[in-house]
Amino acid sequence: MIDPADLPNPPEGVILCDWQTALEDHSDLFKTHLQSVIPLDQHKVSAHHYRHLDRGLFIYVPDETQVKDWLELTIDLSQGAHQQVLLVMGRNSRLTLVESLYNQTTARASQTYLAEIILEEGAQLDYI
């Protein structure tokens, strides 16, 4: 599980939380979009990923929300071998997401990372 204290403060109106919090506080929204782009049974790799998934982030940008500053995420892959970000952008929303991935371990192991991104009509995402 991701420690909420490790997450950056989200821009006003934006939801940014770990998956446990998403299930508790935003269940309908979260469940509607999870696996809508990358289904469990799409491929052997996605099946492997979901079977071993141990950490995740949920980001929701509501309709008509224009985020002026970028949202920066630093993902430590050494904290969980199979991680995922679910990003849902509402109609006519805008966001710049800057994402950094790193791993501090030298151990050889299977790892997967998925970014499942849903853009509603008119949504604009700059993904760096």
Where are the regions that the model predicts?
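Glycine-rich and polybasic anion-binding loops at the starts of cofactor/ligand-binding domains
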Residues: M1-I128
